[in-house]
Amino acid sequence: MKRFHPWLRFLVWKDSLSIRNATFLQRRPHRSFKRTRRRDYARSLKLPGYWSFTAYVWLALWRSKKTFISLAALYAVVAAVLGAVTSQATYQEINNMVKDSVGAASQGAWDAIFQSAALLVTALASPEGVSPEAQVLLVVVGLLVWLTTVWLLRDIMAGRKPKLRDGLYSAGSPLVATAVLAFVAALQMVPFALVMLAFAGLSAVGLLGEGLAMMLFGLFAVLIVTLILYWMTATILALVIIALPGMYPLRAMKIAGDVVVGRRLRILYRLLWLGLTIVLAWVLVLGLTVTLDSGLKNLWPAISGLPIVPFMAAVMSSVSLVWSSAYIYLLYRKVIADDASPA
């Protein structure tokens, strides 16, 4: 009997593998690089309109405005204490480059536009004077703010009235699992980092000096970013699912992958709309702040050293984080409310 024991184990393993494969095909019937006819992948997804859903998220936050404003203010204070406030000179440089790029765009000088965008991303991603330890702590606090927002909204949707301290004390249990998913998202963004490196290298040798070359590279960059966002759709929803009690990272990725099957593009449109609203809010608020800052400092030179714009940027960062967390969580609730199975 011992001679046949390895064969029995092999047959059991083969049967279990076949069952897992059949279950996987039932959950996700569509294969990559194989054509699926439209009639075979129709999966319902009933969502409100873009403006209607944005208003829904706004009202959900406004009903508990004291709690969420306090949460955003807390993150802004932590960012300021850790020194994650970009210098006033950097924002002034960005402002000047943006003004120059607006005029240059009409003349086909796309390099000025990309330089302004790259400078803004660099200024927000790695503020001057922030140590690596402080950056890690900022990421950890940012994940905690994400989890706290999800926890508070989940409690509010259940009919309870939680306080901010309840969320801060209770939402941190899946912090390590959330950090694992954040690392997965960072890996998925590696192609974007490679595009930025390619842009820096090609610009240094002068290959992107002409308008046509810059335009082609810009189209390539937009394509890469779109594919990355399409790829990250499941990961973004997994960052919400991981907040459920007893959830593990791989299981959250599995559930999120099942949720977005047949709906990925429509969910991606909603995420792009979220990004558009945040960008417009940043342009509006920081534009008004820079104008007001310049006017006040011309009237009262004594306040010329007051970093008004950097602190407003810290506030906008915290508000954007809370808004994004709420938007994605409520979007997730709308998606799972339509429990249609994959076609």
What are these regions (language model features)?
Residues A198-F220, V290-I308:
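Membrane-interfacial helix-loop-helix connectors in multipass membrane proteins
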Residues W51-S64, R165:
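Cytosolic juxtamembrane amphipathic/interface segments immediately preceding
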Residues S131-D155, A234, V319-V335:
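Transmembrane alpha-helical segments in integral membrane proteins
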Residues T67-N96, V140, L144, V184-M196, ...:
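Hydrophobic alpha-helical transmembrane segments of multi-pass membrane transport/permease proteins
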Residues W58-L74, L175-V180, V261-L272:
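Membrane-interface helix starts
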Residues K2-Y50, Y56, V77-V78, E93-A125, ...:
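Juxtamembrane transition segments at transmembrane-helix termini in multipass membrane proteins
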Residues S126-V139, R165-F192, L212-V225:
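Alpha-helical membrane-spanning segments of integral membrane proteins, especially the hydrophobic core
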Residues L144-S173:
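Hydrophobic transmembrane alpha-helix segments characteristic of membrane transport
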